[in-house]
Amino acid sequence: MKYQKKVISDLNLCYSLAELTYKGKHCFLVAAEKHDPCYLFDEAGTKIAEPWAGPGGVMTMQQVPEHDGQFLATHEFYSPNDSKNARIIICTPDEEGKWDVRTLVDAPFVHRFGILKRNGIHYLIICCLKSGHEYKDDWRFPGGVYAAVLPENLDDFDENNQLKLVKLKDGMLKNHGYCATTIDGVECALVTCDEGVFLFTPPESPAEQWEIKQLLDVPASDAVICDFDSDGKLELGIIEKFHGDVLSIYRINDHGKYEKCWEYPEKLEMLHAIWAGTLCGKKRFVVGNRRGNRKTIAVSWEAGEYQTEIIEENTGAANILHFMNK
Protein backbone atom coordinates (compact mmCIF):
# COMPACT_ATOMS: atom_id res chain seq x y z
CA MET A 1 0.00 0.00 0.00
CA LYS A 2 1.02 3.61 -0.47
CA TYR A 3 0.53 6.05 2.38
CA GLN A 4 0.37 9.80 2.69
CA LYS A 5 0.69 11.37 6.13
CA LYS A 6 -0.98 14.69 6.83
CA VAL A 7 -0.44 16.53 10.12
CA ILE A 8 -3.62 18.49 10.82
CA SER A 9 -3.02 19.78 14.37
CA ASP A 10 -1.15 19.32 17.63
CA LEU A 11 -2.64 17.90 20.83
CA ASN A 12 -0.62 16.90 23.86
CA LEU A 13 -1.07 13.18 24.58
CA CYS A 14 -3.71 12.75 21.89
CA TYR A 15 -5.58 9.52 22.68
CA SER A 16 -9.27 9.04 21.92
CA LEU A 17 -10.84 9.20 18.43
CA ALA A 18 -14.43 8.95 17.25
CA GLU A 19 -16.64 9.81 14.29
CA LEU A 20 -19.35 12.42 14.83
CA THR A 21 -22.13 13.81 12.67
CA TYR A 22 -22.26 17.53 13.50
CA LYS A 23 -24.68 19.92 11.80
CA GLY A 24 -25.33 17.16 9.31
CA LYS A 25 -21.67 16.87 8.34
CA HIS A 26 -19.33 13.92 8.76
CA CYS A 27 -16.64 14.87 11.28
CA PHE A 28 -14.30 13.30 13.81
CA LEU A 29 -13.38 13.98 17.43
CA VAL A 30 -9.91 13.87 18.99
CA ALA A 31 -9.35 14.08 22.75
CA ALA A 32 -6.45 13.84 25.18
CA GLU A 33 -5.65 11.31 27.88
CA LYS A 34 -4.37 13.93 30.34
CA HIS A 35 -5.46 17.48 31.23
CA ASP A 36 -5.95 18.73 27.69
CA PRO A 37 -8.74 19.66 25.23
CA CYS A 38 -11.06 17.86 22.86
CA TYR A 39 -11.11 19.01 19.23
CA LEU A 40 -13.61 18.46 16.42
CA PHE A 41 -12.41 18.25 12.80
CA ASP A 42 -14.26 18.15 9.49
CA GLU A 43 -13.53 15.66 6.69
CA ALA A 44 -10.77 17.89 5.32
CA GLY A 45 -8.96 17.88 8.67
CA THR A 46 -9.88 21.46 9.56
CA LYS A 47 -10.50 22.10 13.25
CA ILE A 48 -14.03 23.47 13.59
CA ALA A 49 -14.78 23.29 17.32
CA GLU A 50 -13.42 22.66 20.81
CA PRO A 51 -16.11 20.84 22.82
CA TRP A 52 -14.09 21.28 26.03
CA ALA A 53 -10.75 22.57 27.25
CA GLY A 54 -10.59 20.06 30.12
CA PRO A 55 -10.53 18.08 32.33
CA GLY A 56 -9.36 15.43 29.85
CA GLY A 57 -8.72 11.84 30.82
CA VAL A 58 -10.68 10.72 27.75
CA MET A 59 -10.40 7.03 26.91
CA THR A 60 -13.53 6.60 24.78
CA MET A 61 -16.05 8.75 22.86
CA GLN A 62 -19.14 7.73 20.89
CA GLN A 63 -21.99 9.60 19.24
CA VAL A 64 -25.44 9.28 20.80
CA PRO A 65 -27.48 7.56 18.06
CA GLU A 66 -29.86 9.77 16.09
CA HIS A 67 -28.71 12.96 17.87
CA ASP A 68 -26.75 15.40 15.72
CA GLY A 69 -23.56 16.50 17.49
CA GLN A 70 -24.32 14.83 20.82
CA PHE A 71 -21.83 12.30 22.14
CA LEU A 72 -20.74 10.44 25.26
CA ALA A 73 -17.18 10.41 26.59
CA THR A 74 -15.14 9.26 29.54
CA HIS A 75 -13.65 11.99 31.72
CA GLU A 76 -10.89 11.87 34.35
CA PHE A 77 -9.39 8.49 33.56
CA TYR A 78 -5.80 9.69 33.59
CA SER A 79 -4.08 6.35 34.18
CA PRO A 80 -4.65 3.02 35.96
CA ASN A 81 -3.27 4.78 39.04
CA ASP A 82 -5.47 7.87 38.72
CA SER A 83 -9.00 7.00 37.67
CA LYS A 84 -11.12 6.77 40.83
CA ASN A 85 -13.10 9.82 39.73
CA ALA A 86 -13.71 8.61 36.18
CA ARG A 87 -17.20 9.07 34.75
CA ILE A 88 -19.15 9.12 31.51
CA ILE A 89 -20.36 12.53 30.38
CA ILE A 90 -22.90 13.78 27.84
CA CYS A 91 -21.62 16.51 25.52
CA THR A 92 -24.29 18.44 23.62
CA PRO A 93 -23.86 21.41 21.23
CA ASP A 94 -26.32 24.28 21.02
CA GLU A 95 -27.27 26.35 17.98
CA GLU A 96 -24.64 28.98 18.85
CA GLY A 97 -21.78 26.48 18.83
CA LYS A 98 -21.43 26.20 22.61
CA TRP A 99 -21.07 22.77 24.21
CA ASP A 100 -22.84 21.62 27.36
CA VAL A 101 -21.07 18.91 29.37
CA ARG A 102 -23.06 16.96 31.99
CA THR A 103 -22.52 13.76 33.94
CA LEU A 104 -24.41 10.71 32.67
CA VAL A 105 -23.04 8.31 35.28
CA ASP A 106 -20.14 8.15 37.72
CA ALA A 107 -18.15 5.02 36.86
CA PRO A 108 -14.85 4.74 38.75
CA PHE A 109 -12.07 3.26 36.61
CA VAL A 110 -14.22 3.22 33.44
CA HIS A 111 -11.84 2.78 30.52
CA ARG A 112 -13.95 1.72 27.54
CA PHE A 113 -17.63 1.84 26.70
CA GLY A 114 -19.88 1.44 23.70
CA ILE A 115 -23.45 1.70 22.45
CA LEU A 116 -25.00 -1.42 20.91
CA LYS A 117 -28.41 -1.72 19.25
CA ARG A 118 -30.69 -4.73 19.12
CA ASN A 119 -34.34 -4.83 18.05
CA GLY A 120 -34.59 -1.05 18.15
CA ILE A 121 -33.20 -0.70 21.69
CA HIS A 122 -29.86 0.98 22.41
CA TYR A 123 -27.74 -0.42 25.22
CA LEU A 124 -24.81 1.27 26.94
CA ILE A 125 -22.08 -1.19 27.90
CA ILE A 126 -19.16 0.02 30.02
CA CYS A 127 -15.92 -1.68 30.99
CA CYS A 128 -14.11 -0.75 34.21
CA LEU A 129 -10.39 -1.53 34.39
CA LYS A 130 -10.51 -2.29 38.10
CA SER A 131 -12.90 -1.83 41.03
CA GLY A 132 -10.65 -0.32 43.69
CA HIS A 133 -7.28 1.31 44.20
CA GLU A 134 -5.20 2.21 47.27
CA TYR A 135 -1.61 2.57 46.05
CA LYS A 136 0.44 2.71 42.85
CA ASP A 137 0.05 -0.35 40.63
CA ASP A 138 -2.61 -1.80 42.93
CA TRP A 139 -4.27 -4.65 41.01
CA ARG A 140 -5.98 -6.39 43.93
CA PHE A 141 -9.45 -5.32 42.80
CA PRO A 142 -10.56 -6.78 39.43
CA GLY A 143 -12.78 -4.77 37.12
CA GLY A 144 -16.10 -5.61 35.54
CA VAL A 145 -18.65 -4.90 32.84
CA TYR A 146 -21.89 -2.97 33.40
CA ALA A 147 -24.82 -2.07 31.17
CA ALA A 148 -28.04 -0.09 30.92
CA VAL A 149 -30.74 0.64 28.38
CA LEU A 150 -29.81 4.01 26.89
CA PRO A 151 -32.91 6.23 26.74
CA GLU A 152 -33.68 8.09 23.52
CA ASN A 153 -33.58 11.41 25.37
CA LEU A 154 -30.74 12.17 27.79
CA ASP A 155 -31.83 15.69 28.75
CA ASP A 156 -32.83 14.77 32.31
CA PHE A 157 -29.53 13.18 33.30
CA ASP A 158 -26.90 15.03 35.31
CA GLU A 159 -24.71 14.63 38.39
CA ASN A 160 -27.79 14.48 40.63
CA ASN A 161 -29.86 12.19 38.39
CA GLN A 162 -27.61 9.53 36.92
CA LEU A 163 -28.24 6.57 34.66
CA LYS A 164 -28.62 3.33 36.64
CA LEU A 165 -26.22 0.54 35.68
CA VAL A 166 -26.52 -3.23 36.10
CA LYS A 167 -23.46 -5.41 36.61
CA LEU A 168 -23.05 -8.01 33.86
CA LYS A 169 -19.78 -9.59 34.95
CA ASP A 170 -17.08 -9.03 37.56
CA GLY A 171 -13.74 -10.67 38.37
CA MET A 172 -12.09 -9.22 35.25
CA LEU A 173 -8.52 -8.27 36.13
CA LYS A 174 -6.99 -5.50 34.00
CA ASN A 175 -10.23 -5.12 32.02
CA HIS A 176 -8.72 -3.02 29.25
CA GLY A 177 -10.01 -3.88 25.78
CA TYR A 178 -13.32 -3.28 24.01
CA CYS A 179 -14.21 -3.81 20.35
CA ALA A 180 -17.71 -3.45 18.90
CA THR A 181 -18.57 -5.81 16.07
CA THR A 182 -21.50 -7.47 14.29
CA ILE A 183 -21.85 -11.25 14.13
CA ASP A 184 -24.70 -12.92 12.23
CA GLY A 185 -26.43 -9.55 11.98
CA VAL A 186 -26.36 -8.87 15.73
CA GLU A 187 -24.32 -6.05 17.28
CA CYS A 188 -22.06 -7.30 20.06
CA ALA A 189 -18.69 -6.53 21.66
CA LEU A 190 -15.40 -8.18 22.53
CA VAL A 191 -14.10 -7.39 26.03
CA THR A 192 -10.58 -8.40 27.05
CA CYS A 193 -8.82 -8.84 30.39
CA ASP A 194 -6.36 -11.16 32.14
CA GLU A 195 -9.00 -13.89 32.15
CA GLY A 196 -9.19 -13.84 28.35
CA VAL A 197 -11.48 -12.66 25.56
CA PHE A 198 -15.24 -12.48 26.11
CA LEU A 199 -18.11 -11.80 23.71
CA PHE A 200 -21.01 -9.76 25.12
CA THR A 201 -24.29 -9.83 23.18
CA PRO A 202 -27.30 -7.65 24.13
CA PRO A 203 -30.60 -9.41 24.87
CA GLU A 204 -33.45 -9.62 22.38
CA SER A 205 -35.48 -7.48 24.80
CA PRO A 206 -34.54 -5.44 27.91
CA ALA A 207 -36.36 -7.95 30.14
CA GLU A 208 -33.94 -10.71 29.12
CA GLN A 209 -30.30 -11.38 30.05
CA TRP A 210 -27.17 -10.54 28.10
CA GLU A 211 -25.30 -13.46 26.59
CA ILE A 212 -21.67 -13.71 27.73
CA LYS A 213 -19.38 -16.19 26.00
CA GLN A 214 -15.68 -16.75 26.65
CA LEU A 215 -13.84 -17.15 23.34
CA LEU A 216 -10.30 -17.48 24.66
CA ASP A 217 -8.61 -17.91 28.06
CA VAL A 218 -5.33 -16.20 27.09
CA PRO A 219 -4.63 -12.92 28.98
CA ALA A 220 -5.34 -10.12 26.50
CA SER A 221 -5.05 -6.35 26.48
CA ASP A 222 -7.11 -5.86 23.31
CA ALA A 223 -8.70 -7.96 20.58
CA VAL A 224 -10.41 -7.64 17.21
CA ILE A 225 -12.44 -10.22 15.29
CA CYS A 226 -12.34 -10.55 11.50
CA ASP A 227 -12.19 -13.17 8.75
CA PHE A 228 -8.64 -12.29 7.73
CA ASP A 229 -8.03 -15.29 5.45
CA SER A 230 -11.52 -15.35 3.85
CA ASP A 231 -12.21 -18.95 4.90
CA GLY A 232 -15.65 -18.08 6.25
CA LYS A 233 -14.51 -18.27 9.88
CA LEU A 234 -13.74 -15.36 12.19
CA GLU A 235 -10.18 -15.04 13.46
CA LEU A 236 -9.15 -13.18 16.61
CA GLY A 237 -6.36 -10.61 16.47
CA ILE A 238 -4.89 -10.30 19.95
CA ILE A 239 -2.54 -8.10 21.95
CA GLU A 240 -1.46 -10.63 24.56
CA LYS A 241 -1.25 -9.52 28.22
CA PHE A 242 -2.02 -6.04 29.56
CA HIS A 243 -0.12 -3.47 27.46
CA GLY A 244 1.86 -6.50 26.29
CA ASP A 245 4.48 -7.04 23.59
CA VAL A 246 3.10 -10.09 21.76
CA LEU A 247 0.90 -9.65 18.69
CA SER A 248 -0.91 -12.79 17.54
CA ILE A 249 -3.80 -14.21 15.52
CA TYR A 250 -5.98 -17.13 16.60
CA ARG A 251 -8.11 -19.30 14.33
CA ILE A 252 -10.93 -21.75 15.09
CA ASN A 253 -9.75 -25.38 15.00
CA ASP A 254 -11.74 -28.48 14.08
CA HIS A 255 -13.04 -28.69 17.65
CA GLY A 256 -14.49 -25.18 17.58
CA LYS A 257 -11.78 -23.76 19.85
CA TYR A 258 -9.47 -20.84 19.12
CA GLU A 259 -5.80 -21.73 18.74
CA LYS A 260 -2.82 -19.57 17.82
CA CYS A 261 -1.91 -19.67 14.15
CA TRP A 262 0.40 -16.66 13.83
CA GLU A 263 2.65 -14.45 15.96
CA TYR A 264 4.65 -11.38 14.99
CA PRO A 265 8.33 -12.39 15.00
CA GLU A 266 9.56 -9.64 17.33
CA LYS A 267 8.43 -8.17 20.61
CA LEU A 268 6.64 -4.82 20.34
CA GLU A 269 6.81 -2.92 23.61
CA MET A 270 3.46 -1.65 24.93
CA LEU A 271 1.19 -2.63 22.07
CA HIS A 272 -1.90 -0.45 22.19
CA ALA A 273 -3.45 0.85 18.95
CA ILE A 274 -5.55 -1.82 17.25
CA TRP A 275 -8.04 -2.03 14.38
CA ALA A 276 -9.26 -4.62 11.87
CA GLY A 277 -11.37 -4.34 8.74
CA THR A 278 -11.25 -3.66 5.02
CA LEU A 279 -8.51 -1.25 3.97
CA CYS A 280 -7.78 -0.64 0.27
CA GLY A 281 -9.98 -3.56 -0.67
CA LYS A 282 -8.36 -6.14 1.62
CA LYS A 283 -8.96 -7.35 5.17
CA ARG A 284 -6.16 -6.00 7.35
CA PHE A 285 -5.11 -6.03 10.99
CA VAL A 286 -3.47 -2.72 11.93
CA VAL A 287 -1.65 -2.22 15.24
CA GLY A 288 0.75 0.19 16.90
CA ASN A 289 3.01 0.15 19.96
CA ARG A 290 3.76 3.11 22.21
CA ARG A 291 7.30 2.35 23.42
CA GLY A 292 10.58 1.19 21.92
CA ASN A 293 10.48 1.25 18.12
CA ARG A 294 6.89 2.62 18.21
CA LYS A 295 5.80 1.01 14.96
CA THR A 296 2.48 0.99 13.16
CA ILE A 297 2.08 -2.34 11.34
CA ALA A 298 -0.44 -3.75 8.87
CA VAL A 299 -1.00 -7.52 8.77
CA SER A 300 -2.82 -9.20 5.88
CA TRP A 301 -3.33 -12.65 4.36
CA GLU A 302 -1.29 -12.92 1.16
CA ALA A 303 -0.43 -16.03 -0.89
CA GLY A 304 -1.50 -18.45 1.82
CA GLU A 305 0.25 -16.80 4.76
CA TYR A 306 0.17 -13.73 6.99
CA GLN A 307 2.44 -10.96 5.80
CA THR A 308 3.31 -7.67 7.49
CA GLU A 309 4.03 -4.18 6.31
CA ILE A 310 5.45 -1.35 8.39
CA ILE A 311 3.38 1.78 7.90
CA GLU A 312 5.37 4.03 10.22
CA GLU A 313 8.06 3.97 12.91
CA ASN A 314 8.98 6.17 15.89
CA THR A 315 5.47 7.60 16.25
CA GLY A 316 3.74 5.57 18.99
CA ALA A 317 0.09 5.49 17.95
CA ALA A 318 -2.25 5.25 20.93
CA ASN A 319 -5.41 4.40 18.98
CA ILE A 320 -6.62 4.01 15.39
CA LEU A 321 -9.75 5.33 13.67
CA HIS A 322 -10.70 4.17 10.17
CA PHE A 323 -12.30 7.34 8.77
CA MET A 324 -13.66 7.47 5.23
CA ASN A 325 -15.06 10.59 3.62
CA LYS A 326 -18.75 10.30 2.80
Regions found by a protein language model. Give the residues of each.
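Beta-propeller-forming repeat regions
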Residues: 1-326
